[in-house]
């Protein structure tokens, strides 16, 4: 489908405001400036009145969309616009909540690529347009030339104009091209499942799709959670016939290091926890060549910890890579590790989603395959998020 998409970005100073729009299909740019040296307000307003389609931004929902809406509706002075911009930067939501979501532009919708990363990942990785520009191999990565409190000279205005028009827009366009398949997937999900998700990360899409199915059985599902004062691991550990071995372990930097899995299993059976941070175990395994492999265990899975080595195939040894297909969903379904407050409906919904994905893969239905994959991969982690309706920490630990 041929959609009109515009990459865009703004800069705001006490005596300078500029915005650049770039046609995502043709690459053509439109630059507008309102400053102490030039006033293109009328031209910008005319452009906006005829503009339609999607505005592609990086953090636009939390900044650019709001600034543009305020400017368009209130026709502020540059000083008033800068003061408003500061309130947005400082997250004074009472001052700007009326201007969110491009409500004054009914023919425009926002696509915020920043939100394609989950909120926790955005914070922990400190994701920025500049850092992504480096990863994408853009030739010039530059910070804003002057602090946003600076009163710009005309020469400085030219620098900021070039920074906005050239580098920021080029990196944003490059990022859009890199994420184009993900953008198109969200368009397909919106059309097929009738949910709004064009600026959602994968976990949010998973929540909306699962919620759509759960709501048929539990209308008030969004308010439900399963809270537990403690989790006895003996109640959720699966039976396993280990070969009996010596119980050997030590404590190293708050981690329990076990000599074998028999020791790990028996220590876990004795433990009662309240949070997942209490699970910190390692197992040391001997390799046939006399070396050792250390496996770290936590709620995030099993991770091998090894020093850097070069491994080569020989006449007697080959290197093989194995992957367990749909490990988490199969573990959840086979053992019914499902949120207690959604029992039994979640099992049926989740099982149906897994089967729909397998069917889509066989039939090469890429949209359904990718959509169901988002739901499947997102569900496990969401069970550990107390702010969403899937929350039941015991199921995260059990899985």
PLM segments and residue spans:
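Conserved acidic
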Residues: 1, 6, 13, 25-62, ...
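A generic structural motif
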Residues: 20-24
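Short N-terminal binding/cap micro-motifs at the start of the first secondary-structure element
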Residues: 14-19
